[in-house]
Amino acid sequence: MKFSQMPYQRPDLDAVLTGCKSLAARLAAAESEEELIHLYREENDFLAHYRTAQVLANIHYTLDTRDETWAAEQDWFDANGPAVANAETDIARAILSNPHAEALEKAFGSTVLPTLKNRVLSMDERVIDLQKEENALTSAYQRLYGGALVELDGKQLTIPQLTPYKQSLDPAMRRAAYEAEASYFDAHRAEFDDLYDRLVKNRTEQAHLLGYKDYSELSYVRMNRIGYGQKEVAAFRKEVEEQVVPLLRRMLDLRAKRTGIEHPMFWDSGVCFADGNPAPHGTYEELMAGARKMYHELSPVTGEFIDFMQDNEMFDVMSRPGKMTGGYEEIIPDYKAPFIFANWNGTSGDVDVLTHEAGHALEAYLAARTDIPQELQCPGMESAEIHSMSMEFLTAPWHHLFFGPDTDKYELYHAEDSFVFLPYGCMVDEFQHIVYQNPDLTPEQRNAEWLKLEQKYRPWNEFGDLPFYGRGAGWQRQLHIYECPFYYIDYCLATVIALQFFIAALHDHEDAWQRYLKLTRLAGTASYAELDRAAGMKVPFTPGSLTDLSREVETWIEQHQL
């Protein structure tokens, strides 16, 4: 069914809660392994109908945050979603109380019971009102950010539409683009500060009510991190600081020579080549045709997938006023249909959407066509991002369809950019640990902490007198910090595996692709480390785990300078 034809109906909250209560009682009383497994599947199917409505409402809302009809539906889910989450927690508690609970692990893999336990440990009716408020605050942030329009080059532009100007070969235009962005955040400084203040206090109160020392502890449970914790993530950040940051200093020196910019400032960071960054060649229709050709040639299953996506209107990728910034993929459960949302702006990032978000969508598409229960169809986000980030590299043999003579430039830019991202991702993560472990920090103190982390992870950045960024508030443009705290390190953990796929594909693309498919088809039935090992990849939590990888990527970058 085409997206435009998918009907939406607001769920009957009483019916959903009554159904959950009935299922919880039946699950607790199940008298055999077979009955418990059957009821677990029934519960997944029942809640999939609710999630379908929730996802449809959210997609329509983010497509135009100014639409009052869809804003009202989003508000309804913001207000009532926590009650449903609490009912799901009662279901998890009922399953875990059943003496046959271990049968689910035998049937569905190692993650099902830890996932249910984490749900019980991270939700309680005492925090329902706080979660309602949290949802309302994140939606307010989306409206504030998504509604941004700034003046530049005689035009009214959204924040995503500034990106090409940030990559302009004219240094004055680059600086002007950053200043235009900064002007919006500075004009709304009090609102951005207040929203984050209230979110930090809200989440901290939730953590305390649930018996946690601070929200960073609670977040690891809510993020369903299985098999590792804050200690391992801190060790990973240390590896990035020690192995990747020095490499990037050398790499950025090469980039400066390439661009001819003798003393790069922060607003020069988007320029990677003296004659301009690689940009996709072609119209929207031509890029979409290239995507169809690429995925048909990659494998039969990806050909089937891209036909489904394009034939059913499952892409909305053009930036426009009122549309939320950023990009995402969401599965619409009842239709087994992944939807891709993005904001194209004429840069290479447009092609990244056709690979990154399509990696997410392929996993969702495949999992929805198996007998894996719906709540196990997607793994933890550190694993889900492997699907997307690895796809960016595994589609390299077809990048010429989008970049033509600039393909070599794009390959170099993409490899460099993946490494540039790692320190930034670690910055975002460490910043959030600092904030939630010190929830009484003022806005000015939070900004000061961000600037300290700049020196630690990106010491090459010089802001001069650039507004907004110069005062340490640049983190406020990062959606995840407001909307889904502690998510961002997942991109880093996935990037390390994606870079291993990059190196593997250089040696044997077909073998790398088959290993990727093996990992992807496991969906959410295995943990991050189990998925990594299933694909023959190195888990990045031990000292020295990034040493060889960093060296191999650096060598490739040096050998492919243009």
List the predicted regions and their residue ranges.
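Long, well-ordered alpha-helical segments
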Residues: 196-207, 212-213, 251-255, 359-369, ...
